[in-house]
Amino acid sequence: MTDNKKTLVFATANRNKLIEAAGVLGKGFALELPADWGYTNDVPETHFTSRENAIEKAQFVWEMFGKDCFADDTGLEVDVLDGAPGVYSARYAGEPKNPVQNVKKLLRELEGVPFAERTARFRCVIALIERGPEGCEGLPEESEAMAGGEAVPGEGAAMAGGDRGIALPGGGILRVFEGTCEGHIALEPQGELGFGYDPVFIPEGMEKTMAMLTLDEKNAISHRGKAMAMLAAYLGRDEL
């Protein structure tokens, strides 16, 4: 790790996510995991929206270690299933988390649904917490910003409070970014790359599933790639 790199703790135990994030953020960042600081359990996610879960996970790491950090929460939303599996994507088939069984359950529930009606999207919300300047005067407080469950105002936009962010206890500043990827659910799994639902998700305008794309190809169009690119742009990188 070199001094000119910005160090961020990524609030996840999923090293596949870490690899994707590092591929987008580039060499100007050193990414660490909670496990690198001795925390080896899953980071809590107890809410009902991706936005709330991402914020919860980032705050958990911020409060535990006091280090600049970010968290993502990603869900697959299938229109004909009324947005399911959504925030339950990682545990769709129950505990413990089993990506293969999740995919099998999804395909069972879509049995008989024609391809044209299997529209879906991946949604990724990233919450970033950085140590702010002394005082953070003029920023909305966390309680003010969270009241009423105010939505992220747009893809990649900072959450309530605009570019200034939201002041957290302990001197942190919270900002939220969001990316989506539209597509369809395939009739059967295809491809060996990626993880999760990648083998059955065909991005809009493509004929391949995400599991058939290289990491660079995936990052260029994926929900997480878009959200990470917004995060990188905010953090001041010119090269993504």
Question: Where would I find each of the regions flagged by the language model?
Answer:
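Anionic-ligand binding patches
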Residues: 2-9, 16-240
